[in-house]
Swiss-Prot record:
It comes from the Eukaryota. The lineage of its organism: Eukaryota, Fungi, Dikarya, Ascomycota, Saccharomycotina. GO terms for molecular function: 4 iron, 4 sulfur cluster binding; aconitate hydratase activity; metal ion binding. This is Homocitrate dehydratase, mitochondrial. Induction: Constitutively expressed with a small induction when both glutamate and lysine are missing.
Amino acid sequence: MLSSANRFYIKRHLATHANMFPSVSKNFQTKVPPYAKLLTNLDKIKQITNNAPLTLAEKILYSHLCDPEESITSSDLSTIRGNKYLKLNPDRVAMQDASAQMALLQFMTTGLNQTSVPASIHCDHLIVGKDGETKDLPSSIATNQEVFDFLESCAKRYGIQFWGPGSGIIHQIVLENFSAPGLMMLGTDSHTPNAGGLGAIAIGVGGADAVDALTGTPWELKAPKILGVKLTGKLNGWSTPKDVITKLAGLLTVRGGTGYIVEYFGEGVSTLSCTGMATICNMGAEIGATTSTFPYQEAHKRYLQATNRAEVAEAADVALNKFNFLRADKDAQYDKVIEIDLSAIEPHVNGPFTPDLSTPISQYAEKSLKENWPQKVSAGLIGSCTNSSYQDMSRVVDLVKQASKAGLKPRIPFFVTPGSEQIRATLERDGIIDIFQENGAKVLANACGPCIGQWNREDVSKTSKETNTIFTSFNRNFRARNDGNRNTMNFLTSPEIVTAMSYSGDAQFNPLTDSIKLPNGKDFKFQPPKGDELPKRGFEHGRDKFYPEMDPKPDSNVEIKVDPNSDRLQLLEPFKPWNGKELKTNVLLKVEGKCTTDHISAAGVWLKYKGHLENISYNTLIGAQNKETGEVNKAYDLDGTEYDIPGLMMKWKSDGRPWTVIAEHNYGEGSAREHAALSPRFLGGEILLVKSFARIHETNLKKQGVLPLTFANESDYDKISSGDVLETLNLVDMIAKDGNNGGEIDVKITKPNGESFTIKAKHTMSKDQIDFFKAGSAINYIGNIRRNE
């Protein structure tokens, strides 16, 4: 209990905060974060912790606590990080078209008439890239009209902003319109942390997590640890923000950031642009981080002003200068610290098949020969949510102009994807689009396109067994991700390096040191690229048809239609609640090696089934490699009959045989797609037992009523085989104790010959997650509460 003096302190500061900031109305499109409310919460935290120094991430998280005094009870903050579950109130939700379908189908089951927080839908994942916007956009709209109509009707019914096809990529639009210093938001996409480039805490989640925020249900997050990255020096020449994160990925690996928020600090931060910081935060997903963020800078202020949000910058100035809200306290403690000298960074090339295989450009040529990677580069692609800012494009076009002046054009197919209609229109006004097209580049629609596998590639077939090399400025490069071909090697790097490589077409080419032979026999060498942080003439609005109603009101008269015969959309049937007994399953599959969400629930051609759980479940784990046979997408019934993996899952579901999958480290790495949890649940999966999980996927499994367990002893992975019976021994007791049983589950393994043994497994279930499990899913649980209100 606070003393009367402390209660007076908080009350007095509440009045101060309220008077310093513009009032935040219930207008769902308010751009200014609720600073007065956040600072009042922070005051309470400061009192409880005896004014302990806080990191920026802690300030933003704790200021969004539903009940600060209940959540933070100790001045020792080290007992919270990595241990305590926080109940949070996010400020907004953003959803892309592929994941929004399932999120909204789940939201519909709650019976609410509007969302509890501002929300937006962005149609970017379902647009195919092939011939350019003029042809690709109408074709993609026609193909996906049913889905777009469904999403738009949901938006109208519930008062959600609807950014239609062609408007841009979700993360670029969020940065341009919604992200703000100190904001906390959720997004149904793993690269939602892109918004951290503007000082927000933005976290990628599955649709069921988004429904928490949409329904006003406190959203739960295990308090992350804080990884501090100290930046010194200044980027120069060819080095870019992309190289900061590709280098960091090499240092930390794809799971080195799991359980952490990455917070950047140091004098080097002030030398970066806002969009450069967004690039760095975007690919924090590739190291497994919960999210990434930057302290408020002058670059943020410039970007806010350039995107018509001067009032946000003014309020942020007050929050920083009067209350020190938007930066870490002086003596804030990080759980780990990594230092990177920006002045010493050289361009990096990451890949193939994993975003953490990082190679400095000076070593790439030699390494590519040693590894026998294809030396001919077959395509160059720039853009994506990671690198489609005006600054990126202006630096790239500087290289294009240099080459054009020398009489050179790209020697391989070269694709450009603008991040938004605002970016595209500004590039068009400034003549940059014309320069790209005059020099052989194909400018695609404002959408994800090839980055998410929506690439109708003609020069290489999906079934080609020959390896080929592409260079992209994307963020992820798993097998078959971009063009459906498992033998395409995607090397991730900056858009500047991609562009230069497109003029050479040779993996041995290093644009920092090498020249290209001209037809006249002379040598041409690129000079380091130059560009503008922001357009000198300001941003161009672009075509009105690509902008939504900015302040939509919910309309309960709008009918949301789902055709029962549709193969694209399907209303959800609730999963059955837990029966109160121990789980007894058979091991269906033992997975070997990397198993990302692309392996578990592939995108590409499967994106069209995102709103139809039954149909998309036919792709479950089709990319997984069977540890026992080395085969991909092969599993064997108890009698030895061969099936594809989802085929066996369906058979066992029909037989009434629940199943378990065994896997290795970082299971579920990659995107936020909850279908990777929904489909196994739909097909009868009850347990996932792995060496370690990626954060988002583990949460998604819990939300859908699947029990995620990790080996207490990793060597036990080697003791289990497909066909074994796996049953829990103390699940009932664990649930009776609301998960507080020491975090262990005893698991009995019985071999086909009757031999049995017991192993220890670990769980991370909170009380709320236990309630989800008992109800059958989080949506069942929320629905039960709503019906009883």
